[in-house]
Amino acid sequence: MLTVMGLVLLGLSELSFGAYASLALLNHPNIASTALRRLLGGAFALLLATTLVALSLPAWRWGAQAAFLVAALLFLVAWARVEPSDDREWMSDVARTARATITETTITFHNVRNFDYHSPTEFDEAWDERTYRLDRLAGVDLFSSHWMGPAVAHVFVSFDFGVDGRIAISVEVRRERGETFSWLRGLFRHFELAFVVADERDVVRLRTNHRKRQPEQVYRYRLTGTPEMARHFLLAYARRINAAVERPEFYNTLTTNCTNTVWELAEMNPGRVPFSWKLMISGYAAEYLYDQGRLDSSVPFAELTRLGHVNARAQAADRAPDFSERVRAPE
């Protein structure tokens, strides 16, 4: 016989699962009919409410629990059939999937995006292949691009190979043609995950020079650590990129996004940092790394952020071949 505490815990677990299942059915990516999605989501929500009420009614309790269990199992079976795919009609900027070839001394990235943008939606497409010597990896930069105040940002990294140049890696939503992003639908398997490997003139300049409707403010921070730590981080990224080629993944607004994917990869590094709520709110990721001693601590964070603001320098550099050097030029 369940105690009062046991009933409370059972009710909370059912509430959590039932709320997710109801919302998932309301936003089911494989059910085109809005009316059917509403019917299924509403029915599950009604069953959840009935089950929770029945917890206080001994005569109805276990019958309601059995019905809820059957519905939950049916939902899980149906939800497991929603699988990510590499075979869709993708937007041009995520049409190709990056992959990496690793040897003892080099790393080669295939399908490196190097678009020349005229506007956010107009560009000359170019996809490259780039090879770098691992012994020339000098460090890693973190870019944080803000467009809705301090809390909301897109975070990506760039690996510095010195005279060989730099390569940026950005974890993004792989949108289909005509598809728009929604943070709510991003919780329910609507979008695949994309690892965009790109030239900085592509991924930085797009945000600083062309996105004007919601202007983005882009900041660059140099991560502390040894070249060996940077190499661990790079190789972890490369393995994850290759794994996504073999087995596509879903993007998730909370669990598999630009910020916590970077943290997961960094956790493989001997110099990893502990998880924090600030990594869930992407705009505070850089500040958290500063607090953990992973950014230059010789100046206050506000000053480091001011010095790292790259918009004006990126706009001045524009298409220049030395774009990356110019966005890093001291004031």
Which residues are covered by each model-predicted region?
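Alpha-helical transmembrane signal-anchor/signal-peptide segments
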Residues: E83-T103
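Activation targets extended, charge/polar-rich intrinsically disordered C-terminal tails
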Residues: L2-T50, A238-E331
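Transmembrane alpha-helices and immediately adjacent membrane-cytoplasm interface residues
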Residues: L47-S85
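Short, glycine/acidic-rich beta->alpha junctions
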Residues: S92, G149-A151, V262
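A short, structured loop/turn motif at beta-sheet edges
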Residues: I102-T106, D160-D164, G225-A230
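Soluble catalytic domains of enzymes that build or remodel membrane lipids, polysaccharides, and related
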Residues: F188-M268, P274
